[in-house]
């Protein structure tokens, strides 16, 4: 399991909704990644739409997948 020190926090915009609560997110630096909602966002029933600004956490081991940890207002 990755520790907090092993994560990279970035911001991006939701580009596409994928099946299974996954999302295509375009990062600020122009790199597209696949992301899923973190557990607390699922429990709070927070939904994402195309165009939402989000904060994602990425593991240093796999830079193509991320976890959405915050949806900006």
Swiss-Prot record:
InterPro entries reported for this sequence: NA-bd_OB-fold, RNA-binding_domain_S1_IF1, S1_domain, TIF_IF1
Subunit structure, as described in the record: Component of the 30S ribosomal translation pre-initiation complex which assembles on the 30S ribosome in the order IF-2 and IF-3, IF-1 and N-formylmethionyl-tRNA(fMet); mRNA recruitment can occur at any time during PIC assembly.
Keywords (A to Z) from UniProt: Cytoplasm, Initiation factor, Protein biosynthesis, RNA-binding, rRNA-binding
Pfam families hit by this protein: eIF-1a
NCBIfam families the record matches: infA (TIGR00008)
Entry's family note: Belongs to the IF-1 family.
GO cellular component, one term: cytosol
Organism the protein comes from: Chlamydia trachomatis serovar D (strain ATCC VR-885 / DSM 19411 / UW-3/Cx)
Compartment(s) where it occurs, according to its Swiss-Prot or TrEMBL record: Cytoplasm
Disulfide bonds: none
Annotated protein name in UniProt: Translation initiation factor IF-1
All residue ranges annotated as the S1-like domain in the record: 1-73
Protein origin, superkingdom: Bacteria
CDD domains: S1_IF1
Keyword Cytoplasm attached: yes
Cited Gene3D superfamilies: Nucleic acid-binding proteins (2.40.50.140)
